[in-house]
């Protein structure tokens, strides 16, 4: 009987050890996998204030910058040659975290970001970005509370419709530093 109990105990330790090793390996893979971050800069000034705000938020992180001014994205409903929406969409799908940056123009999100958002409507299924995070950087020269609220409303609705987890908005460096905690 002692021998059977000893064998059972050894077998239990062997199984438990293998299970722990498997779980540990799984945890290491999660730690080793660095999240892929895409910063979409809607500003026509690629090195301007929107990009500077992204640098504050993403300091110490590896990320890719996609300047919308470098892409031709036709407005919703146009079917012109040379449209690059699919390229931008693919980069967004490949990312774990998307940081959308827009200057405040005419009291709202800039046209290049607006066109990108509008192009999702229709061809892109709701919930397509489930499990991905969206951060919003929205800056301008003294935007009013209404402008900030409207921009955030638009971005949070976009995130909700397409399945992103909306992590929030920053419109200044101190807010970007605080938002960085969610990365």
Predicted regions span which residues?
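Short, glycine-/small-residue-rich phosphate/pyrophosphate-handling segment
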Residues: 130-168
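Residue-level detector of intrinsically disordered terminal segments
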Residues: 9-12, 26
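Sec-dependent signal peptide recognition
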Residues: 2-7
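N-terminal beta1-alpha1-beta2 submodule of the flavodoxin-like/Rossmannoid cofactor-binding fold
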Residues: 20-125, 156, 160-183
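Short, glycine/serine-rich, charged loops/turns that create anion-binding
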Residues: 11-12, 44-45, 141-143
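Alpha-helical transmembrane segments and their juxtamembrane interfaces
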Residues: 12-13, 77
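C-terminal motif of bacterial Sec signal peptides marking the signal peptidase cleavage site
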Residues: 15-19
């Amino acid at each position: 009987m002692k021998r059977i109990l000893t064998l059972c105990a050894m077998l239990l330790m062997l199984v438990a050890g293998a299970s722990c090793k498997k779980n540990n390996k799984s945890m290491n893979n999660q730690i080793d996998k660095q999240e892929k971050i895409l910063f979409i800069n809607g500003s026509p000034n690629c090195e301007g204030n929107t990009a500077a705000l992204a640098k504050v938020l993403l300091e110490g992180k590896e990320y890719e910058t996609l300047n919308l001014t470098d892409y031709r994205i036709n407005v919703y409903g146009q079917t012109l040659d040379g449209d690059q929406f699919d390229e931008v969409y693919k980069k967004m799908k490949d990312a774990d975290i998307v940081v959308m940056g827009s200057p405040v123009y005419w009291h709202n999100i800039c046209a290049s970001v607006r066109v990108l958002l509008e192009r999702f409507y229709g061809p892109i299924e709701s919930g397509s970005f489930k499990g991905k995070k969206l951060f919003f950087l929205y800056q301008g020269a003294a935007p009013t509370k209404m402008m900030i609220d409207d921009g955030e409303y638009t971005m949070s609705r976009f995130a909700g419709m397409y399945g992103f987890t909306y992590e929030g908005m920053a419109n200044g460096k101190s807010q970007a530093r605080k938002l960085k905690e969610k990365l």
